[in-house]
């Protein structure tokens, strides 16, 4: 049975831990609001960009750009896995890594070649355990205080270069789509060959200089926009998951403090009772 001193030290230690988790929860809540606003603001632009590209793509025939039609092969798959740079965010990283592992295993079973590009240290650490030979690169965002379109452009340049060089036939990004503080949806989205959903409209458009020229210019931007949207969704999901995880940790610390305090009071009461009995017994002996 632990001594009163041990119990008191443990209560103090858990209280200090609770202060830390509470502070982290508050920081995550502040960051979540900014990240959520950025993700929600980017969605309409990405949807409109996709609708325009889909409208242009619908009129393309055999001469469609390679980014849209593909290169005629389906052998080399590049998986871009987006996770966080830091931990303490519950199952945020493990869920997306699990989805990427599942897809990679399915592709290997089909005889495909899998390559992996990670964004975020935590995904790199987990995937390198059993997919080290498939790694082709890593994007470090640890020094980025606020995600910008330039971050997405850098990743887009890498995957576009791999596609143009024949080093990747299909590119799929893996990220957590933000729904709420307690709900982040692991998502796999193919970006090359490009897939965009057409908007439901009866409007007819005239394009200048030509549909082909505009499409050739928009497709690389569309890939970068999809990656940027995924980065923002992932960032909001990370802060939501961290806020939820730290809230749970704070609650658990409070429960543990209550239990330890009860145990401390009972032990202290037992010690006092024992001392009283010894005093009374000594007095009776006299």
Swiss-Prot record:
Protein name: ATP synthase gamma chain
Topology in the lipid bilayer: Peripheral membrane protein
Summary of the function given for this chain in its UniProt record: Produces ATP from ADP in the presence of a proton gradient across the membrane. The gamma chain is believed to be important in regulating ATPase activity and the flow of protons through the CF(0) complex.
Tagged with keyword Flavoprotein: no
Similarity remark: Belongs to the ATPase gamma chain family.
One family name in Pfam for this protein: ATP-synt
Annotated localization: Cell inner membrane
Claim: Thylakoid is one of the keywords in the record: no
Cross-referenced PANTHER family: ATP SYNTHASE GAMMA CHAIN, ATP SYNTHASE SUBUNIT GAMMA, MITOCHONDRIAL
One annotated GO biological process: proton motive force-driven plasma membrane ATP synthesis
Organism from which the protein derives: Fuscovulum blasticum
Keywords: ATP synthesis, Cell inner membrane, Cell membrane, CF(1), Hydrogen ion transport, Ion transport, Membrane, Transport
Main location: membrane
Gene Ontology cellular-component terms listed: plasma membrane; proton-transporting ATP synthase complex
Domain of life: Bacteria
């Amino acid at each position: 049975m632990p001594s009163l001193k041990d119990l008191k030290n443990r209560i103090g230690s858990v209280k200090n831990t609770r202060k830390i988790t509470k502070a982290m929860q508050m920081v995550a809540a502040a960051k979540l609001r900014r990240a959520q606003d950025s993700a929600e603001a980017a969605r309409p632009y990405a949807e409109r960009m996709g609708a325009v590209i889909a409208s242009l793509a619908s009129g393309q025939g055999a001469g469609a750009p390679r980014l849209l039609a593909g290169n005629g092969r389906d052998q080399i798959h590049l998986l871009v896995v987006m996770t966080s740079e830091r931990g303490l965010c519950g199952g945020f990283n493990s869920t997306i890594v699990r989805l990427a592992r599942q897809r990679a295993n399915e592709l290997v079973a089909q005889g495909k070649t899998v390559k992996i590009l990670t964004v975020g240290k935590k995904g790199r650490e987990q995937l390198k355990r059993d997919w080290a030979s498939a790694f082709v690169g890593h994007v470090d965002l640890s020094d980025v205080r606020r995600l910008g379109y330039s971050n997405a452009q850098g990743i887009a340049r890498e995957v576009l270069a791999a596609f143009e060089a024949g080093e990747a036939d299909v590119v799929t990004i893996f990220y957590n789509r933000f729904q709420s503080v307690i709900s982040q949806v692991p998502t796999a989205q193919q970006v090359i060959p490009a897939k965009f959903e057409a908007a439901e409209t009866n409007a007819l458009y005239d394009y200048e200089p030509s549909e082909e020229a505009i499409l050739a210019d928009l497709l690389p931007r569309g890939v970068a926009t999809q990656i940027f949207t995924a980065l923002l969704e992932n960032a909001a999901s990370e802060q939501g998951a961290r806020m939820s995880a730290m809230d749970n940790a704070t609650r658990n610390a409070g429960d543990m403090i209550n239990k330890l305090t009860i145990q401390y009071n009972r032990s202290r009461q037992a010690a006092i009772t024992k001392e009283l009995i010894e005093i009374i017994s000594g007095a009776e002996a006299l």
